[in-house]
Amino acid sequence: MRDVQIDLGEVPSGESGTALPRAPVPYRWILGPLTLLLVVMLGGGGPPPQPPPAPFVLPLTLGDGIRLDENRLYVVEQADPVGTVVRHHTIRAYDLPGMELLDTYRVEVTGDIQRIADVGDGLLMVGFSDVQNGDPGTSVMRPDDETPVWTRPVDLYGIAPDRSVLLAYEGPGANQPVWRGMDPRTGAVLWSMEPSEVLQVTMPVESFWSGFPERIYALRADGRLEVRSARTGVVTATTRPAGPLRDDTAIWAAGGLVLVGRGTEETTAYDQETLAEKWRRPGPVMPEDGFPQDCRPTICIATYGGGGFSAVDPATGRLLWRADGYDAGEVIDGHVVVSQSSQAEPALALLDPRSGTVVTRIPGWVSGGPGPAPGTAWVYRLNQPGYQLAYGVLDLGDGKVRLLGRAERIAGGCQFNTAVLVCRRLDSSIAVWRL
């Protein structure tokens, strides 16, 4: 503060020069308001906001891969030797968000590692595909022990949150697999559903993100529709849809309903728990290349290949709205979040699930999935050239982004979970930020 004089008064003659008199009485009244004004101007007088902590940087090579779940980060080192059929993989498991090394696993498989899941008690489930024929396989490993606890030629679909049962499937083909419920610690088969019994199988769409369905819906060869417990394999409800089975008969499960479509002729909806019929209407409800999503109070349908988004009324099956021009989308806490990621400048938009109208647009940002609190989403933007990253939290209610931090020299590959953000850097290392 330049050119400001403060009157300290005068020292009376004959008194010590160390004594400081009181401020002159006429000006004392202004000190209170002046102090208040300075506090307001300085933002409340508190300390300035602190920048986000520096990330934990883990050196990796370009051939190393990473897998992220809710509380673990797995680093899959490049297989040794490269290009052979039998490959030796080293997997390091880190605790999140502290990045403490927990265990190291050594896996010998005939191919590449596709999936990793924590089974509990230090056991790690590893899913792989055979490099020669593409057949799936799953092994459960102990730390620092290349001998599997068990191995089976199955592909992992999901594991229950309490780690008590896993859902897997195996040959003879991708269209007609054998579905199995298994004990993840021992590999014992708890129940099976053979392809000779069923024509089609589907699960509620929510399980694609949660990782495990509580119910499985099957259209049997004899024309019956049934619901099974994914934990026990027990059939809990059954019904026989009207009309004969056809080659184009298909089933889906979303929004509390199981939909049975008979080509372009008819669609019937059933309750997901009881299979009681809810409604029936002529024509298709689900397009051939559609994917249902639960965005209650409606059922949203994403069309593959950038075909846009639409929504139907779960009470009647009537088409409510359609929004074109979006190539990706997701439903977070009932909010429809769509994106235009194929454009030079990515953009997000929030749609009203009842009408499909655009509530707000968020240019330049990419969704990172459900955020730290209900009604929020993680978002980030990566500027190239420049390799500059910004990340934050999107409020799905008002469309505003709260910036959390920035970073330089980021190549991409960013992933969020509830605790961290992980991104690849230009030197192939990964940076891990606490959120």
Model-derived regions: residue spans:
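Secretory-pathway ectodomains
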Residues: M1-L435
